Structures are given as C-alpha cells and as structure tokens.
Amino acid sequence: MLDIRQIRENPQIVQELLKRRGEYDLQPIIELDEKQRQLETERSQLQARSNQVGKQVGEKIKSGSDPKGTEIKALKEEGNKVKAKLSELEPEEKELKAKIEALLLPLPNLPSESTPIGKSEAENIEVKRWGDEYIPQNPKIIPHYEIGEKLGIMDFERGVKIAQSRFVALMGAGAALERAIIQFMLKRHIQVGYVEVMAPLLVNSQSLTATGQLPKFAEESFKCAADDLWLIPTSEVSTMNLYRDEILSAEQLPIYHCAFTPCFRREAGAYGKDTRGLIRLHQFNKVEMVKIVHPETSEEEHQKLVADAEAILQALKLPYRILELCSGDLGFSAAKCYDLEVWLPSSGTYREISSCSNVKDFQARRANIRFKERNKKGTQYVHALNGSGLAVGRTMAAILENYQQVDGSVKVPEVLQPYMGREFL
C-alpha cells in the first residue's frame, strides 16, 4: 500500500510515478485525507477542552466550591457536551479511514526510479543472455506436451476428466521428474541460506490483501466462500503473512525463506493462451524465494535473488535470458522486477520461468510488518522481495524440450540423475 503521508506531502511526484504505470487519479484520496485531518484537528481540540474542563472541575471542588453548585454544574454540562461531540466524531473518522484505505488498496506500487519507463512488455529491456551453447541443434524437437504424452508421463485427457481443462496428471517418470526438480531446487536454496517453510495452502482474505492479491486479483483466485478462505496463487502469500502484524528486531534481518507449494490460479484473463501443455495450468507446483530485509539492503538483495534463480537454470544447463521490466509491465506489488525466461526450442521462444521482484515497503505496509533498531526510537517498515526459484512445471517443459534426443527419448539433466536414479526417460 502506498504511504498516505507521501501522497499528502508530494502529490505531484506520486501522481507522476503512477502515470508510468497507467491512469490513476489521486484527487479523491487527497480530498478525503484533508477531511480526515480536519476531523483529527477538531478531535484534538475537543479532547483538550474535555481534559481542561475535567481539570477545572477538580480544582474548584478542591478549592471549596459546592460540587452541586451552578458553577460546577455548568462545567460538567459543558464536559458532557464535549464528550458527546467526541463520540459523534469517532464513527465519522472511522468511516473516512475506511474510505481512504479502500481507495489506496487498488493502487499499485510506485515504480523504482531505476525502472525503465514504458507502456508494455514490448519495452522491456534484455539485460543478459546465458547458455546459447546449450541450445539444442536437433531440428525435430516436438513440444513438451507431445513428448510427454508419447513417453506416457503426462495425461492431459485424464486431468480434464478429473477436473477440467488446464489440469494434468503426471504419471511414473513424469511424477518422479517433477519431484526431483522440487528436491533439487529446495536443496540448492537451503544450501545458500534459505530456511524452508511449509505454510497453509488456504489463506484468509486478510492474508491475500496483505500481499496485494486482493482486491485487484479476486477474479484470478479460487475462493472457498463459505469459510472466507482462498487457495494460494503463490507461496509468497503464506510465507509473507507469517510475519503479519509483527515487529522484528533489526538483528533478525535479513530473513530468507524458500517454500514448495502447489499454486492455484483461475487464469481468467488467459482465454485462448497456452491451451496445451504445462505453461499455463490452474494448478501448478512452484518453489518460491521470499526475503524480508532492511530497506538499506533491498537493492543488493534483489540482485542476489536474481542470481539465486539463475543458479538453478545454470545448474540444469537450460538457456535463458533476463529482462528488466518497464514500468507498464510491472506486477502490481513490484517497484522493480526482472523476469527470467527459459528457451523453449519447439516454439523458438523464451518463456517466463521466474519473476524476481523488489516490492520495497509496499507489502509491509499492507501487512504491518515492521522492525526496530537497537537504541533508536520508533519502528520502520521492512522491505520484501520475492521470486520463483523456479516454476516447476515450466522447468519440466524446458527439460523435455532442451534435453530431447533424436531417438525420441529425453536425457535427464546430470544434476537430477541422483534424484531420479536414471539417465533417460
């Protein structure tokens, strides 16, 4: 959530930064904030008068005035009127705060000053390409979903029968490969300092609001309406909310977590896109990296986060590129973001496999996650970062295509062979 104080003090700057992302009008928020501050001033004045009246009553009684006399009676009547007015202001203030929050919640994060300005993905900037030497030269590579079905390791037809379109059943070596990928990713992240988390797959509305999925992406999520519970679209949600409404010590930072979970998305805006294969499913597995850090280190931590995602792709020897996203293509909560895209030879394109975002204090404000430094007054909001490390289904798709052999078999990447106990599928 954006800082109302920043909007109040620098409305033109905030409006200009928001314009880099789209059309957003701050004027209704500014007007409501002005009303709220006027009410706060009035409440402070009334509270001061109430305290003054109470003090005067006490002093007069102490000096010998008749507690039932007209002077004391008049003061008490005034005090009661002031208290009544204060009581009237309370719901009005509460309503104004709720209205301001309702207008703030749909606003995206402000893009970082270093984020390239642009309107769409066409203006993203490629900053790195790796692994061209690993691009397969086999001219007969077929899509991952075709080789998966030929090998008997993917069953889309039964996935549809069990659920609906955009579901798959992995069989035999397919299930084993998925599990091997997950184990390898988690082990690697843990080795470099991430602490594994297994948190709920069902979360409440407050949790989704804290990380920015609600209210904007309600239509993209699966909801259990009777219980006010939602299936998570990413484990970033449950991992970040471990610390919701907490004050950490500066010594606890940085916090690194990794988590494997199934993720669930309705893909409401993806009609007709990637209708076959593992690229866009309603249920998919993902290993997520989450960092909670000191604001002064978040930019450095962002680069490390990208490197941790890269390390998985490099270990698997999967060709990829990195894009720096422009302001118009940023995710809702991101201030700065790099997308890692893996090479899929059957289509001759790079496809997103990880999105590494620095959300700065945007989620921390919504989730009320702060930290306190020793010998310093007050608290600060933490900075948060998240990134896929990696999307498991897309990793499998990339392996099935990049490691496809001329004879129709698929070689298991060397780093996964100890988990699989085999060299080929």
Curated annotation (Swiss-Prot):
L-serine binds at T234, S235, E236, E288, S388. It is found in: Cytoplasm. Residues 44-54 have a biased composition (Polar residues). PROSITE patterns: AA_TRNA_LIGASE_II. Keywords: Aminoacyl-tRNA synthetase, ATP-binding, Cytoplasm, Ligase, Nucleotide-binding, Protein biosynthesis. It catalyses: tRNA(Ser) + L-serine + ATP = L-seryl-tRNA(Ser) + AMP + diphosphate + H(+); tRNA(Sec) + L-serine + ATP = L-seryl-tRNA(Sec) + AMP + diphosphate + H(+). One of its GO terms (molecular function) is ATP binding. It comes from the Bacteria. NCBIfam families: serS. Catalyzes the attachment of serine to tRNA(Ser). Is also able to aminoacylate tRNA(Sec) with serine, to form the misacylated tRNA L-seryl-tRNA(Sec), which will be further converted into selenocysteinyl-tRNA(Sec). Homodimer. The tRNA molecule binds across the dimer. This is Serine--tRNA ligase. It comes from Trichodesmium erythraeum (strain IMS101). The gene is serS.
